[in-house]
C-alpha cells in the first residue's frame, strides 16, 4: 500500500509524471585537493550521508588520506557554489560508515564506527562538539533519526555472544545542540540472536520509532522491522519483504539486503531495498510504505522501470519530505557504465527512471545518497570513479523541478 493512495486516500503529494521533469546544476566536488591514491566511501547504514538543516547542507564520508580510514564532514550554504574545507570528525585509529542527521538551525549530529565502538558528535559550520562514545561492545553500522532535533534515536548492530544484534539508544541534545545524555542501548528484539542482525535503518515520527534491518534467523536473509509507539518498547519483528520460496537449487528466500527508511508526509514512512526475487538478473529495487507511522507496511512495489529489468541495481537510497514527496536513487549499468538513476512517486505509481546528467557519463557513478528539502529540491551525492576499481571522489549536484512541471498540490492526510 503506497504512502498516497491513487485518488481515494491521498497521503503523498506526488512528483510530476514526466521523466524529464528535473533540472540539475553542474556537479561539485565535495572534497578538494585529494591525492589520486585516496579512496573515498559513502557507506552509511540506511545511506544517510547527506542532510539539510536550515540553510546548510552537510555531507559525511570516510577516506584513507591519513593512511587509515577516517571520517570527515563538509558543509555548504544552499546558495553557495562550493563546499567548505572538510573537517576531520573521527578521533581514533580507524573509523567507518559515518551518518549525518539534521538537528535544525544549521546544526547536525554525526555518528560513526570507530575502533569497534559507536561515536557521536554535533557538527556545524561554526565548529565541532565533543566526540562521545555511546557503545562498549563490538559495534558498528549506526543510523540516526529525530523529529525535533532534541530527542534522537540511534540504532546500530552490536555483537551479543556469537552473533550481532540490533540495539537502540535515546540521545538528548541541549538548546545549543550539545549532547547532554545517551541512554544505555537496548535490543530492539529482546530475544537472544540465533544468527546475525545487521545494517539497520531507523525512522522517527510522532507515532513512534520504526527500525528495519537484515536478519538471518530463518537461515536466509530477510528484512524485519519493529515499531515502538512509546519509549523503547518495540513490537515483535515483522517481515518487510515478501518472501519468495525458491527451489533447493536456487536457495531459500528471495535474497534481500540494504534496507533504507525515510519519513514522508504526515508521519508516514517509506522503505526501499535491494531484492533478488528476480534472481536471473541480480538485485532489483523494491519499496513499501507505511500509513500508520511504521506499525505496519503495505505490499511491496517495484520502483525501477522495465528498461532496468535485465540489469542489476545497487545501493538504494530514499528520501521524503513533509510535503509527502518520495524519491529513490540507486546505480546500475543499463547504459554501458554505472550511472545514478532516480524514480519518484506520482499519482500513477512510480515514475519512469531518470539518470541525472551530472551523475551519468562514461565514468563509474555509484553509491548515491539523497535528501529532499522543504521546497522539493533534491540534494544528491555519489561516488565518481574513472574505472570500476579506481579511487572514488564524492560529488554533489542539486536537482529542481522545471517551472512548468511542479508537484501536485498536497491533499489532506487520511485519518
Regions found by a protein language model. Give the residues of each.
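Bacterial N-terminal signal peptides
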Residues: 4-14
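Extracellular, repeat-based ectodomains that mediate carbohydrate processing or recognition
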Residues: 19-415
